[in-house]
């Protein structure tokens, strides 16, 4: 297999192409113009895929001449350059990249929501205390499309916010870009205000009631198992992201940790999109196939 067929090579090429649609080549007119912004974003995406720290990326890129060539790097940026690029990168840009990667997939309006946690063990205890971070992990909530398993929206917090306080802001954010008809969720999102708000926008809430009495059991029995079972797909996406891209955040500042999670979501969607493109390519191929009968 050629190196150009590997997933890291394709990911670097695709992430740079998408970044060129979102950001200008240089962040300022006073820039030294050594590296472009799309090159920095592509390197950060490769870092997520390779599960490496920023300090180890310089050595990794030196051993990848094909990736250097496809990104147009005359020489590899050092650790401090990549740290500054990560710090300058705005979360709005990553949100636009997440939207562009999620638009590739056909959707029927079926979504699901669930929360998970990413460990912040690399953050110092003094920083955790000073910033009033109660949890030792970053609580992350994903809204996914149940047909394609693509991530539509992300919410991050380090405080003890309840699920019912997170679902509506994240839902309104996703609804600006995507159409949602059905939204299953677990009992942690059980709140009548949440149900009323979802119905106001034409969304059918499939949120099971906490069973305090016979009426709650009757409400849960009315829900179809096929529809409520789609909620487990959001747990599948949480598990896939943690296994493929690591469940530990290596950056220390809060905003860099948010960017790290957004980069994981962007890379997840891009890899899903590359699988679809590969399948379509093989389906429309005009090569003759001979088989023995």
Language-model segments: residues:
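Polybasic low-complexity intrinsically disordered regions
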Residues: 32-38, 49-52, 59, 82-201, ...
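Short, conserved phosphate-binding/catalytic loop or strand-edge motifs used
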Residues: 63-66, 76-84, 213
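DNA-recognition alpha helix
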Residues: 55-71
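A short, polar/proline- and glycine-enriched secondary-structure boundary/capping micro-motif
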Residues: 162-166, 217, 286
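A short glycine/serine-rich beta->alpha loop
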Residues: 26-33, 70, 156, 251-253
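Basic, amphipathic alpha-helical segments enriched in Lys/Arg and hydrophobic/aromatic residues
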Residues: 226-293
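Basic, short loop/linker segments at the boundary and entry of helix-turn-helix/winged-helix-like folds
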Residues: 2-49
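Helix-centered, glycine/charged polyanion-binding patches within enzymatic domains
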Residues: 187-254
């Amino acid at each position: 297999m050629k190196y150009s067929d590997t997933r890291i090579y394709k990911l670097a090429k695709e992430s740079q192409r998408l970044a060129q649609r979102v950001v200008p080549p240089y962040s300022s007119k006073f820039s030294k113009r050594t590296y472009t912004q799309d090159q920095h974003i592509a390197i950060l995406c490769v870092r997520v895929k390779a599960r490496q720290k920023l300090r180890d990326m310089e050595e990794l890129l030196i051993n990848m001449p094909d990736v250097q060539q496809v990104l147009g790097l005359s020489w590899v940026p050092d650790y401090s350059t990549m740290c500054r690029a990560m710090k300058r990168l705005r979360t709005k840009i990553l949100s636009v990249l997440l939207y562009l990667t999620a638009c590739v997939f056909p959707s029927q309006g079926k979504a699901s929501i669930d929360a998970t946690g990413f460990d912040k063990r690399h953050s110092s205890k003094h920083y955790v205390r000073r910033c009033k971070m109660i949890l030792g992990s970053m609580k992350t909530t994903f809204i996914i499309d149940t047909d394609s398993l693509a991530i539509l929206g992300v919410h991050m917090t380090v405080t003890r916010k309840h699920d019912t306080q997170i679902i509506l802001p994240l839902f309104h954010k996703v609804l600006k870009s995507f159409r949602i008809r059905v939204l299953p969720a677990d009992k942690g999102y059980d709140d009548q205000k949440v149900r009323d708000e979802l119905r106001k926008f034409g969304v059918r809430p499939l949120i099971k009631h906490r069973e305090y009495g016979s009426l709650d059991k009757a409400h849960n029995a009315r829900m179809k198992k096929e529809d409520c079972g789609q909620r487990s797909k959001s747990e599948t996406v949480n598990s896939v992201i943690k296994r493929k891209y690591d469940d530990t955040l290596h950056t220390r500042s809060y905003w860099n940790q948010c960017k790290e999670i957004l980069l994981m979501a962007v890379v997840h969607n891009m890899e899903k999109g590359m699988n679809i493109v590969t399948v379509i390519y093989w389906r429309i191929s005009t090569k003759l196939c001979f088989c023995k009968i």
